[in-house]
């Protein structure tokens, strides 16, 4: 009986400790880890250029209302990865060079005050911007051709949303932004830079 009395408090204590992980919120180390969206499962667009340079002209300020540095995934890094996945040089004897220029990859926030003084129904509105230009330069005659896409996405959530939920919303926001951008930029390349595309999509002909 003495042994049983000694074991019982230990068992109760063990149950209490194991239950703490569900009673208390997750620490930052236990938050889900997110990664930038990738498009390497799609067939890349092959250009008749000998090189593709990826250039970022975006400079984060790290001060509000700019909050892109708080996101679990970087829009700027995602843009660079998109260019690596989707745009390929395919004519190494050519004197033409392609540039993927990231002009904007920022996020701003705006507090929207609620009209209820008793309950906090303030909201935070986020706007993610992505502006990319693809430019092809022919070094033989210094001619240029380019196409540009300005994509944006907005999200409004309650101001008291916890960090784990915020990161989940932010990650979804970035993924949707790039899914839309990927479609728009692919269309623009086929329309405006078509003469430089080697693997043009085949349009079926029906009789």
PLM regions with names:
Residues 87, 104-106, 130-140, 151-159, ...:
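Beta-strand elements of well-folded, non-transmembrane domains
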Residues 68-69, 143-184:
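Short secondary-structure boundary motifs at beta->alpha junctions and helix caps
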């Amino acid at each position: 009986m003495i042994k049983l009395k000694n074991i019982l408090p230990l068992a109760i204590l063990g149950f209490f400790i194991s239950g703490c992980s569900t009673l208390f919120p997750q620490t930052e180390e236990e938050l889900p880890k997110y990664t930038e969206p990738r498009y390497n499962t799609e067939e890349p667009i092959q250009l008749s250029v000998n090189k593709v340079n990826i250039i970022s002209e975006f400079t984060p300020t790290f001060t509000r209302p700019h909050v892109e540095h708080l996101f679990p995934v970087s829009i700027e890094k995602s843009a660079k990865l998109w260019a690596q996945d989707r745009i390929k040089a395919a004519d190494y004897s050519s004197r033409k060079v392609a540039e993927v220029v990231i002009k904007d990859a920022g996020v701003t926030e705006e507090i929207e005050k609620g009209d209820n003084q008793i309950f906090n129904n303030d909201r935070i509105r986020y706007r993610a911007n992505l502006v990319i230009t693809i430019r092809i330069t022919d070094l033989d005659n210094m001619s240029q051709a380019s196409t540009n896409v300005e994509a944006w996405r907005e999200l409004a959530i309650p101001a008291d949303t916890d960090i784990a939920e915020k990161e989940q919303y932010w990650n979804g926001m970035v993924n949707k932004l790039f899914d839309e951008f990927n479609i728009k930029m692919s269309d623009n390349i086929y329309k405006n830079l078509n003469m430089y595309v080697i693997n043009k999509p085949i349009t079926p002909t029906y009789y």
